[in-house]
Amino acid sequence: MKVVEAICEIMKREGIETLLAYPVNHIIEYAARTDIRPIIVRQERVGLHMADAISRLSSGKSIGAFAMQHGPGTENAYGGIAQAYGESVPILVLPAGYA
């Protein structure tokens, strides 16, 4: 089993049904294989706020998950990460890229 497969299996066991993602991230393909619905966004900040909304609307019962590229993609997402952290909103952020 590859690490990315293990991550997706753990996400599924934790009840994550949707993975918001900005390409390129290998987790997107493996999440789809694990029956986690990938939704592709056009900008990192938007995806992070969507993950934040999933957690807020479910009162934390469903954790919003967001995957993005490493480097500049992560920097674009910092505003949303800081807001979620400051307001104690549970989100899962998975920065990755080409291996």
What are these regions (language model features)?
Residues 1-99:
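N-terminal alpha/beta PP-like core and its mobile active-site loop of ThDP/TPP-dependent enzymes
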